[in-house]
Amino acid sequence: MELWRQCTHWLIQCRVLPPSHRVTWDGAQVCELAQALRDGVLLCQLLNNLLPHAINLREVNLRPQMSQFLCLKNIRTFLSTCCEKFGLKRSELFEAFDLFDVQDFGKVIYTLSALSWTPIAQNRGIMPFPTEEESVGDEDIYSGLSDQIDDTVEEDEDLYDCVENEEAEGDEIYEDLMRSEPVSMPPKMTEYDKRCCCLREIQQTEEKYTDTLGSIQQHFLKPLQRFLKPQDIEIIFINIEDLLRVHTHFLKEMKEALGTPGAANLYQVFIKYKERFLVYGRYCSQVESASKHLDRVAAAREDVQMKLEECSQRANNGRFTLRDLLMVPMQRVLKYHLLLQELVKHTQEAMEKENLRLALDAMRDLAQCVNEVKRDNETLRQITNFQLSIENLDQSLAHYGRPKIDGELKITSVERRSKMDRYAFLLDKALLICKRRGDSYDLKDFVNLHSFQVRDDSSGDRDNKKWSHMFLLIEDQGAQGYELFFKTRELKKKWMEQFEMAISNIYPENATANGHDFQMFSFEETTSCKACQMLLRGTFYQGYRCHRCRASAHKECLGRVPPCGRHGQDFPGTMKKDKLHRRAQDKKRNELGLPKMEVFQEYYGLPPPPGAIGPFLRLNPGDIVELTKAEAEQNWWEGRNTSTNEIGWFPCNRVKPYVHGPPQDLSVHLWYAGPMERAGAESILANRSDGTFLVRQRVKDAAEFAISIKYNVEVKHIKIMTAEGLYRITEKKAFRGLTELVEFYQQNSLKDCFKSLDTTLQFPFKEPEKRTISRPAVGSTKYFGTAKARYDFCARDRSELSLKEGDIIKILNKKGQQGWWRGEIYGRVGWFPANYVEEDYSEYC
């Protein structure tokens, strides 16, 4: 058996790889094992499986999303622990880039083999590899792995189901505290009986939880005040006394509501206390630091350690330490929506059920808010790691939003035209361009994205050579610009998507709707959205605030916020007049039949137009420009780029007279179907793979064309508009020929034109159907029912899934991130907040 397959078998025995992972399938390749390991997460989990607590998983980024910085940090944590706790020699270890870039995967296998032979690993009763009888020689298969990895699209999220859930330990403590004596149940329970059980559980667990808070105050906080400084007490106990006060009143009102017939007013108590429970925001954001501080204080002072043991003995006979109990409030606040969900399920009366749903929504919203505080704490740790690794950085990265992506690229700038090797960190509001020096980074340029925009350049994609895939980052005024080059087309696509997402976070759709001026904002206090009344989530840049009236909103709610109270009343009318004026100008230009020029040399604003004659006009080779002002003796002309509809000034030496060429022979293309009706296209594409397309001549009008494409199991039709000798499917971009249009959308997603159509033109219909090796039944993509979106949700980066109210989502995973589920819709896969959907239990499979 090949050595890498022996390694795979060993990793399965160590409970790191699931037995059904695709690396075990017939026809599996070694690159699939490399891809599974290269972010370092499973390697760190491996060490913990062999030696419990060998690595503190809080120091490992469990969702690195292939961030090179975070993956390398995880890998180096694994390597250092192999030395320190497993006794491996330095000579037995691979280098971090041997795995991440798969420069020497044979050395990675060698290290794992050495690890399997250590006494610690063998004590687990797992057979090491290779055994003496088995052959080792499979070095040849490791060559070229780096190129194969470059073509790998996404990591396998199901892998992380094998990683320890850091919440599990706290959950066990909570369940232990809340456990009650079993009550005898009737042999056959009615829905009424089940509802009574739910109500009893809500009351009993609230009583026990309030007692636990009282015990923390009485048996730990007060006795320790004589041993610790006031600042230590505040750091360790945070606002636990505020929690106790709130829950004492909450329990009193809950009991009163439960004492009324049918507990009809219980829902009002939960809705009323949603706002008071916002004190959990502070507690949950600081509890991890509190636990670490407690550990440091106890380790430094033996008298404190002894006092803590004494307090624990008095509080609960030593069953739970203070560190254990500090995790309970976070667990409790995340349980209310689960308790109410069960109560709703067993409530029959329609009005009661509807009222309880309001309470359930309130507690789901609260739970999501708490989960986002935890997620943002992880994000801030990630930002801190970036900050500490970048030299010459004199400002806080947290002011520039959440990290989007990081990695190696090549770059040219206006000042320096030769390609430079660089490492870049992209955040919501900034791009950091650095030079890597070992494990640290030297900041070379800090780009504030507020004044930049992204423009694709697909010229390098045709060659498909390494480092030829490029797009441009251009300053609005044209004084500065960068060309960013990427190793593969897929990497370029990922980076471009994240740039577009970052810029859409800075300038979101509907930012100026209803007279507002919404900007990304970090709210110090927990705040509700003006439109939907739900909480803004997290600890920083939770949403948007209007610069004028201070209204707060989610990104997805900006268009629904009531009109701005601080803005002039003529705003809507002014907008309407401007739009009508632009339409009149467009009509006038068409009537005049202005001369057209063809661009043969690009222009991105350098040199800028002289003086203040007007904005520059971006030009790409092949664009058609309609002249609006042009004199032969002048060097600068004004025109409209018909590809983008932008108007501006450009040097006249970048264009030549446009000559309309002879009609193209389309029959040579595998995608051209000739004259065809919609029904004919649907018949051809019905049994083809998603992404298969054809271009047809419309039967009713031979001068017009349409694209038909199979997407999300349906056939969609897109009209191609023809005017002025140009072809377009949207007003944003025009092409000189049908071939150029098709080639562009073979490389660029149609979602820029149609939001629900996130696909490229992938497979011409005349190409033979390429069937990939089918997965075994055990490995087939399974989903755990469906859910219906109750609200809009706007993704903040490419790992998230945007939703529209009413969307039906296939649920793929509920385990990854607390409060977030992974799902699929319209062929797109990503994470979305669980409280934004209503699950359809009838479709569970």
Swiss-Prot record:
InterPro entries: CAMSAP-like_CH_dom (IPR022613), CH_dom (IPR001715), CH_dom_sf (IPR036872), DBL_dom_sf (IPR035899), DH_dom (IPR000219), GDS_CDC24_CS (IPR001331), PE/DAG-bd (IPR002219), PH-like_dom_sf (IPR011993). The DH domain is involved in interaction with CCPG1. Residues 1-119 form the Calponin-homology (CH) domain. SUPFAM superfamilies: Calponin-homology domain, CH-domain (SSF47576), DBL homology domain (DH-domain) (SSF48065), PH domain-like (SSF50729), SH2 domain (SSF55550), SH3-domain (SSF50044). It holds the Pfam family C1_1. The modification Phosphotyrosine is found at Y826, Y844. A zinc finger (Phorbol-ester/DAG-type) spans 515-564. Interacts with SHB. Interacts with SH2B2, GRB2, GRB3, DOCK2, SLA, TEC and ZNF655/VIK. Interacts with SIAH2; without leading to its degradation. Associates with BLNK, PLCG1, GRB2 and NCK1 in a B-cell antigen receptor-dependent fashion. Interacts with CBLB; which inhibits tyrosine phosphorylation and down-regulates activity. May interact with CCPG1. Interacts with CLNK. Interacts with THEMIS2. Interacts with NEK3 and this interaction is prolactin-dependent. Interacts with ITK. Interacts with PTK2B/PYK2. Interacts with HCK. Interacts with PTK2B/PYK2. Interacts (via SH2 domain) with SYK. One of its GO terms (biological process) is natural killer cell mediated cytotoxicity. Keywords: Guanine-nucleotide releasing factor, Metal-binding, Phosphoprotein, Proto-oncogene, Repeat, SH2 domain, SH3 domain, Zinc, Zinc-finger. Phosphorylated on tyrosine residues by HCK in response to IFNG and bacterial lipopolysaccharide (LPS). Phosphorylated by FYN. PANTHER family: PROTEIN VAV, PROTO-ONCOGENE VAV. This is Proto-oncogene vav. It comes from Homo sapiens (Human). Residues 194-373 form the DH domain.
